[in-house]
Amino acid sequence: MGERDQSSDTDQERKGGKHPYSSHYSSDFGSSPQSSGPSSPVNTPPCASNREKNPKRHLSDHHVRHQTVRKVSPKAIPNKKGVRVGFRSQSLNREPLRKDPDIVTKRVLSARLLKITELQNEVSELQVKLAQLLKENKALKSLQYRQEKALSKFEDAENEISQLIHRHNGEITALKERLRKSQEKERMAEKRVKDTEGELFRTKFSLQKLKKISEARHLPERDDLAKKLVSAELKLDNTERKIKELSKNLELSTNSFQRQLLAERKRAFEAHDENKILQKELQRLHHKLKEKEKELDIKNIYANRLPKSSPKKEKEIARKHASCQSDFTDLCTKAVQTAEDFEPEEFPFTAQTVLCYENRWDGSEYLPSYLEYQERNEHGSESLSSTLEQEGKYSDDQDSCTAKQETGKSECEWEREELDKVKGKSSLLGRTEKLVLEAGSVQTESYQAQTIDKFQDEAERLKTEMLLAKLNEINKELQDPQSLSRPLLPLLPNFESKLYSPDRSLRPYTFSESLDRSFNGQHLSDMSFLTPRDEGQSPGLIRSPAPSDEFSFGSYVPSFGKTPGKSNPPSQKNSLLDFQSNMSEGLSKDSLDFISRKEKKATLMEQLFGTSASASATNTSASTTTNTTTNTNTNTNTNTNTNCNVPSKSIDSHFPAASRGDLDPLHFLSGDRSSRVREPDGEDEDLFLSEGRSFNPNRHRLKHTSTKPTVTAVDSIDEDIEEVTLR
C-alpha cells in the first residue's frame, strides 16, 4: 500500500510540472536558464557539478526539508539530471551553471538519492505502521466500548443480585416467623389434645362409675330422694288447691269491689250535684247578703258592726269549722242583721254616759295604717270574688271534659279518675270554705270602714257635749263658791277617786276583766279618766279659750280617733250602769241646782259658740235632769241585769295598733252606738246597741217592756241576726 501511495504522489508531481527534487536543484543551480522548462539530459552535467561544489549547502537544505518527501521512482532520476536549477540559485550564486558535472558530484548525488530513497522508504514504512496503529487504535476503541458496555451490564446484574438477595433475606425472616408461630400453635394444640384426652379419660371413668351406681337399685340416697319427691308433689297439690281457692275469693272480692265502686261512684255523682246546688245557693245567699247589707246601710247605720269574739270563742269556732262544713256558713252569715227582726234605735248622747280616758297614742298616729289595712281588705275582697268565679268555671270545664272522655276509656281507668275527682272536689270544698271565711272577715272590715266617718261625727258631738259640761261646772263654781264642798256634777264624775278607792274591788264591776282581755294586759291604772286633777286651779286658767281643733280640760288633752275594730260593749254597759247606780244619789241632790244655773250656762255658750251651741246645751241639760230622776228608781235592776249578762269581748286583732297595747278613747266613749241611754219620751225604747256579739247559743236576749226601767242592758242580739244554713 505504501508503494501505491508513493507512485500516486509521483504521478501528481509530474502532472504539476514539478519534480520532487526541483527545490534542491533550484537552490543549487539557480543561475541556469533552463530551470523553468522540462529537464533534458544535456543540462544534467552542470547540475551535477553545482551539487558537487556546494555539498554542504545541499546537505543543510536536505536537513531542513520536511519529512513529507515521498519515494521517487528510479525511472524519473535520469530524466531530471539535465534540468537546470531555478532562478533563486542563479540569483544567489551569480555563478554560471556548469553543463557537465563531475563524477564526484554524481556520486554524491547518487548517495543523496539513495539516502532520500531510504528515508522515503522509512517514511512509507512509518506511514504504514501509523495506518496499522490507527486501525489497531480503532479496533481497541471499539473493543473498549464493547467491554465498557459489557462491564456496565455486569455491574447492573450485580446490583440486581444484591436487591434480590435482600428480598430473599426478608422472605426468609418472614418464613422463619411463620414457622415459629406455627410451631407454637402446634405445641398449644398438642397440649390441648393432651388435656382433652385426659378429660375424656376422666369422663369415661366417671361414666363407668355412674353406670355401675345406676345399675345398683337398692341405695339409701335413692330412697331419700324418692321420699322428698313424694312430699314435694303433695305440697304442690296443696298449693294448687290454695291457688284455686284464692282465685275464687279474688273474683268474689273483685265483684264486690265493683259493686261497691259503682255505689261510691253514684254517691260521688250525687255529692257533685249537691255541691253544685250548694254553690249556687251560696252565690244566691251571697247576693242576698249584699242586698241586706245595702238595706242595713240605708235603714240602720249602727247595725253593721261585727265584733270579734274572745280567744276562747275563736278556738271553739275553729273546732266547729274543722268538724262540720255547715258551721262555717252559719258563722260567716251570722254577722248579718236584718231589718225585719231587729231595728235598733238611735239614742242621743247624754252627759251621764260620757267616759273619757287618756291614751298614750293619739288616733292620728295609727289612723293612716288602719285606712291602708281597709284598702288592702277591699282589694282582697275583689280578688276573692274573681277566684271564686274562676274555680266555678274550672269545675264546670273539668266536669264536661271528664264526661267526654268517659266513653273512650276502660273501666279501671274510669274508676281511678272518679276517685281522683272525688278527692279534687273535697279539696275544692276546703278551698271554698276558706274563701268564704275570708269573705266574712272582709265583710267585717268593710263594715268597720263604713263606720269611720260616723265615728268622727260622734266624736265631734262628744267634744261639744263635754265642753258644755265643763262650762256648766265652771259657771256653777263661779256663781256659787260654796258648791266646791259638794260632790262633783254627774256630767264629770270623779273617776280617779273611784279607781283608787279601797272598796272598788268589792263592787261588781266588770271593767277589770274586760279591759284585761281587750287591751292586751293593760291595766286600768294606765288610763286616767277625764277629771280635773287640780281642783285648786285658778278660774282664769280654766276659762282660757280652747282652740278650734281640740279642747283642753285642765292638764288633759283628749285624743279622738277612729274606732279600729270591735269594742267591748257589754262590759262598757256594765261599767256605765254601775257608775250610774253609784252616782244616783248625787244626781238627785244636785238636779235642782243644775236647773237653776242652766240659763247662765246658755248665755255663756252663746258668747263662746253662738246660738246652736246654747240650744244643744239646753237639750243636754234637760235630758240629764230626766235621766237622773229615773236612774234613782232603777239602780238595783240595772246592776242585776248588767252583772249577769255581760260577755267578754276582745278588740279586733286585725287592727295593727291593738297589738302594741293602744287604747282608743272611743272604746270607752260608748256614745258611738254601744252604751247610750235615751230619755223616756214615749217614742222609742231604751236599748244598748252592742257593737259585739256572742256566739254562745245558751245565752238569751233580755226582753224589756215599757213598765221596766229606762236603762236596760241587752246581753246579745244573736236571735236578731239572720242565721243561714246550707244543710
UniProtKB/Swiss-Prot annotation:
Q: Which GO terms describe its molecular function?
A: protein-containing complex binding
| Protein transport recorded as keyword | yes
The beginning of the lineage is:
Eukaryota, Metazoa, Chordata, Craniata, Vertebrata
Q: Where is the composition biased (Basic residues)?
A: 54-73
**Where is it localised?**
Cytoplasm, Cytoskeleton; Cytoplasm, Cytoskeleton, Cilium axoneme; Cytoplasm, Cytoskeleton, Cilium basal body
What sections of the sequence does the record tag as coiled-coil?
A: 112-301, 449-480
What is the stated purpose of this protein?
A: Involved in intraflagellar protein (IFT) transport in photoreceptor cilia.
Q: What is this protein called?
A: Lebercilin
Domain of life of the source: Eukaryota
Where are the stretches annotated Disordered? 1-82, 381-409, 526-577, 613-692
Q: How does the record describe its quaternary structure?
A: Interacts with NINL. Interacts with OFD1. Interacts with FAM161A. Interacts with FAM161A. Interacts with components of the IFT complex B.
* Compositionally biased region (Low complexity): 22-41, 613-643
Q: Which family does it belong to?
A: Belongs to the LCA5 family.
Q: Enumerate the UniProt keywords alphabetically.
A: Cell projection, Cilium, Coiled coil, Cytoplasm, Cytoskeleton, Phosphoprotein, Protein transport, Transport
In this chain, where does the modification Phosphoserine occur? Answer: 7, 49
